[in-house]
Amino acid sequence: MTEQKKKLEKLSGVKGMNDILPQEAGLWEFFETTVKSMLRSYGYQNIRTPIVEHTQLFKRGIGEVTDIVEKEMYSFTDALNGENLTMRPENTAAVVRAAIEHNMLYDGPKRLWYIGPMFRHERPQRGRYRQFHQVGVEALGFAGPDADAEIIMMCQRLWDDLGLMGIKLEINSLGLAEERAAHRVELIAHLEKHMDVLDEEAKRRLYTNPLRVLDTKNPAMQEVAQNAPKLIDFLGEESRAHFEGLQRILKANNIPFTINPRLVRGLDYYNLTVFEWVTDKLGAQGTVAAGGRYDPLIEQLGGKPTAACGWAMGIERILELLKEEQLVPEDEGCDVYVVHQGDAAREQAFIIAERLRDTGLDVILHCSADGQTASFKSQMKRADASGAAFAVVLGEDEIANGTVGVKPLRDTNANGGKNEQQNVPAEDLTEFLINAMVATAEDGDD
């Protein structure tokens, strides 16, 4: 007597770490192609760093009293050697680590870009996930406001390339370390006068990272934050000149911006310029790109003092905007779907499919789902569902006559406006299909 097999429990993904399914992947590919083209046009080079880094990298780089390090990192102890490791919550520190480790700056400044998944342990919601994807740039070795302006303008070009409207730029200056120290004294004194209004999070940050109190979303604290001493009033001559230089370049290039004195960013490595690109179309998660200047970071991670600036943008949030503004490109499907009946036709179908791929056409070859040969009718349904422009048909008659059937599957002028099957000599198939594809493309442009 055999035991009845127990039904296995269906496994699901980790909450906040989402699958990107085929029907969504086309939008991702569209964005990735667009952003990579933009990055190349500015002379940026791709760098790829590991997903896992030593925990100390982020503690030293991001700051021990930041939300990311205190509450959001996925950290673990390596069972093999006891090392403390972390799945990257952001990538600037890792890129800087790689640049130092591989002595990349020995021959001058570098323009680098990256793309990939990041990980933060937080409550999943629209636009905020535990695994999320970022694309970012790091301009290493550039000290002037012109570099700040260029990386900001890169974002504007990307919005234009994607067709996105209404993303607004906010900028601020965090000045230099001594200016922040003077402001910190005044800020703490101001906040101490309003202890009865501060929430627990603000009280916790008061003496460790008081700048972050200004970034509060608590309605009860808005007036206190609004009336707090502004860091911009503490800027010295050098910091003011840098900030004014940035503004001049942005104005000269017709990049509108707002100065937001409460813009501080959540990472400790920033100085001088900080900026965010924000939208009101994504609810609470309105920041789609953010960055600034982080001159102290390279030295902080063991390198020689080197100026640097960069930005990162959340890909999921940008894709949400593309959907919101109905800018999702249509899936064009493949070019050709090959259907066949009989052993001889199947063998020839493989040869034809490979020959067509050699010309650059995208080709799907019908394969059986159950090991049995499907009828022509069933295969044609699959061809229609694939989104292919043409079906190539091979059966006993076609093999005997040395021909191939070609049937348009979309509305097209390639066959006199008729979607009727034509028989084409096998040796002429490639030329026929290429001409038909050109005619179809011209039809679509009319």
UniProtKB/Swiss-Prot annotation:
Keywords: Aminoacyl-tRNA synthetase, ATP-binding, Cytoplasm, Ligase, Nucleotide-binding, Protein biosynthesis. It is found in: Cytoplasm. One of its GO terms (biological process) is histidyl-tRNA aminoacylation. Pfam families: HGTP_anticodon (PF03129), tRNA-synt_His (PF13393). Coiled coil: none annotated. It comes from the Bacteria. Its main location: cytoplasm. The keyword Transport does not apply. Its EC number is 6.1.1.21. It catalyses: tRNA(His) + L-histidine + ATP = L-histidyl-tRNA(His) + AMP + diphosphate + H(+). This is Histidine--tRNA ligase. It comes from Paraburkholderia phytofirmans (strain DSM 17436 / LMG 22146 / PsJN) (Burkholderia phytofirmans).
